[in-house]
Amino acid sequence: MTLSPPARLARILALAVPALLLGGAYLSQYGFGLYPCEMCWWQRWPHFAAVGLALLAYVTPPARSWTALAALAIVTSGAIGLFHAGVEYGWWPGITSCALVAGNGSGNALEDIMNTPLVRCDQPAWTLFGISLAGYNFLVSSAAGLVIGRLLMKDRRA
């Protein structure tokens, strides 16, 4: 079955967006020394899944379903990015040990400090216009996932 132009564009975006975001993440990591924290890794996993799902859309029917699942994975990464950005901006506490929490319960402040990972989730490694990488992941991933979903719905109505 041949896909309509909107569905083809959705499939292209479902592959290109997470691949480019992962490429940017690895470029910033290995090219510029911005090493990922635990929550940064959480944001990458849905993008890996989205790339795999989008590739399936090219080789295995039903392409629309695989593309929709890829869009869902992309939006999931965006949601994790929103949570991570909120931790970085102090809107809410982090749920992992990579955010520095006053008094981790050991009763030994030095031990708490020594057990805190070197790359902390509650401190943005880099910002542009006051937005962290997690914030940009939220913006790009959420917008891309919604655009892909819209293209797929447009295709269904045609």
Regions found by a protein language model. Name each.
Residues L55-P62, G149-R156:
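Structural signal for the C-terminal ends of transmembrane alpha-helices
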Residues V17-G24, A50-L53, A73-F83, V140-V147:
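Membrane-embedded alpha-helical transmembrane segments of multi-pass integral membrane proteins
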Residues W42-L55, N104-S106:
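Iron-sulfur (Fe-S) cluster-binding segments and ferredoxin-like electron-carrier domains
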Residues M1-P46:
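Transmembrane alpha-helical insertion/packing segments
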Residues Y89-A134:
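Extracytosolic (periplasmic/ER-lumenal) interhelical loops and adjacent juxtamembrane/interface segments
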Residues P5-A16, V59-G78, G145-V147:
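Interfacial segments of alpha-helical transmembrane regions
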